[in-house]
């Protein structure tokens, strides 16, 4: 293992939950306002996820005041305080870019139900 890989592996976060495209998540982001720092929640559907080691990222989409808002988060960023999975979505695609063109009830995603044994 070379030096660059070793440094990247030290910076990877292991406290993040497992989530996939279609899941509704709440991301707590650290926001600096002057000298203060506070947490801001961003809740939406994961429409894309890119797994590239330290360069991993995911895109979250939500509807705010009738307008679609998308935000790309770096998975291992220090600006992300926590991620909470609110509900699991049942989808067949890895990238849900088709949701950009849908509004209202057409943009809903079915919930994946856990089967107890």
UniProtKB/Swiss-Prot annotation:
Biological-process GO terms, alphabetical: translation
Role noted for this protein: This protein is located at the 30S-50S ribosomal subunit interface and may play a role in the structure and function of the aminoacyl-tRNA binding site.
Keywords: Ribonucleoprotein, Ribosomal protein
Cited NCBIfam families: rplS_bact
Organism (species): Vesicomyosocius okutanii subsp. Calyptogena okutanii (strain HA)
UniProt name for this protein: Large ribosomal subunit protein bL19
Transmembrane segments: none
Entry similarity comment: Belongs to the bacterial ribosomal protein bL19 family.
InterPro entries with a match to the protein in the record: Ribosomal_bL19, Ribosomal_bL19_sf, Translation_prot_SH3-like_sf
GO molecular function, one term: structural constituent of ribosome
GO cellular component terms, A-Z: cytosolic large ribosomal subunit
């Amino acid at each position: 293992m070379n030096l660059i890989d070793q440094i990247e592996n030290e910076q990877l976060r292991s406290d993040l939950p497992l989530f996939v495209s279609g899941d509704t998540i709440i991301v707590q982001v650290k926001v600096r306002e002057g000298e203060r720092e506070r947490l801001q929640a961003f809740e939406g559907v994961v429409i894309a996820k890119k797994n590239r080691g330290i360069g991993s990222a995911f895109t979250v989409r939500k509807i705010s005041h009738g307008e679609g808002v998308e935000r790309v988060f770096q998975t291992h960023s220090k600006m992300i305080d926590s991620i909470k999975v609110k509900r699991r979505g049942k989808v067949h695609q890895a990238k849900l870019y088709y949701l950009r063109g849908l509004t209202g009830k057409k943009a809903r995603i079915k919930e994946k139900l856990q089967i107890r044994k």
